[in-house]
Amino acid sequence: MNQQATASQKTRAEQETENEANRLREQIDTALAAVAVRSPDEIESLQSAADRIERAARDLSDALRQLAQQRKVPEI
């Protein structure tokens, strides 16, 4: 099954959860790249990365909770 067909079968909550998970992965990758750079200028970058990861993790948690709630409600 192609990706477009699979995407059309996902609910909005599933798509949002997947998007938030991907965003968190991207933030983690960016943070890991910042860890590899050792310079005084990178201190602020590391702190910013931590803030972005916290926000992305919260957004993913919210999306997962919404998805769980949606799946509790039986479809008619």
Question: What is each stretch, according to the model?
Answer:
Residues 33-76:
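Short, charge-rich amphipathic interface segments used for partner binding and complex assembly
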Residues 2-38:
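N-terminal acidic leader/helix
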